Amino acid sequence: MYENLYSLIQQCGTIGVTSHFRPDGDAIGSTLGLGLALQAMGKKVYMWNEDGVPARYAFLEGAEQIVPVPEEIPADLEMLICVDTGDWKRLGDRTQKLFADFPQIVNIDHHGTNTRYGHVHVIEPETAACAYVLFNVLKSWGVQLSKAVADALYVGISTDTGSFQYGSTTPEVMHAAGELLAAGVDVADVNRRVYQEIPYSSLLMQREVLNHMVVECEGMLAHYSMPAGRKAELGVGLEDTKDLVDVVRVLQGVRVAVIFEDLEDGRIRMSLRSKDPSVSVAAIAAQFGGGGHAMASGIRMAGQLEDCRERVLNAIRKELSHE
């Protein structure tokens, strides 16, 4: 599988790398890690993301190369590689339209709900992170990892394992992290930048969640809803709403946590997390056209906040009542 992709890449001079909108650490780390590695292999590389690079990951060397998706496909582009993106729709509207008929799309991912879009697939379901998949890919190709590539892949693995707290953290994952440290990752510096420098606006958003979250089902279900206009009232931005579900998830006794966010475009965004392996939020999300992992999934649903919320909560309540 890895060898086939290597052969295809060797035939290309110019490659694009992109990932899902509202990128997390794994999306950015995977895009940058692969992009920089391909450059080291002598390729011309474009790196794109519809929403750009979140501020917390801007310290990564080369992050400025990840730019908005262009209006037109570059004339010299021969291959598009999509990383950490389980569904074509998650790439964003502009990317979908621009590359709808592109002849060579590679799908590298770790989501169990991957829809297998594209022409070439390297999909390892429920692996710790896409960055971990890429670590193994690059290692199999004999690529020498620079500090910049190692930093990017480490951020991807660390953030998608909850800083190595989740069940996906296997001995193999820890061994990979050790190899990345040996390649130059400064763990203290990376952890400080990613986890210990939170903007004041993000703390305001966390306070909002703590003040207004709802706990039900005998403490097993916790959720918070952000109505239209609330971000503007609080003076917070899009990036401040990232990872809010973790504020709810850590409450003692909670097995499922959900954040509902009115996107003000007729759609509701939902982030679902499970702390119980017997409750798959991926299965719940799939009922509403969403997907992801068993312990972490998302949904985007058209409709009113109250209606969408109740439909999803009822599905979760039903699942919890079966226990």
Model-flagged regions — what are they?
Residues Y2-T18, G29-A58, P74-L77, T159-E323:
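Hydrophobic helix-and-loop "lid/oligomerization" segment in the mid-to-C-terminal part
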Residues T18, R22, C82, N107, ...:
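Generic enzyme active-site microenvironment
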Residues G25-T31, W88-G92:
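Short glycine/serine/threonine-rich phosphate/pyrophosphate-binding segments
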Residues W48, I81, Q104-I108, V120-I123, ...:
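Hydrophobic/aromatic beta-strand patches that form the interior of the parallel beta-sheet core
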Residues E61-A63, V69-V120:
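Active-site cofactor/cluster-binding pocket
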Residues G62-I66, I123-E126, K275-D276:
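Short, hinge-like loop/turn segments at secondary-structure boundaries
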Residues I108-A176:
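Short alpha-helices
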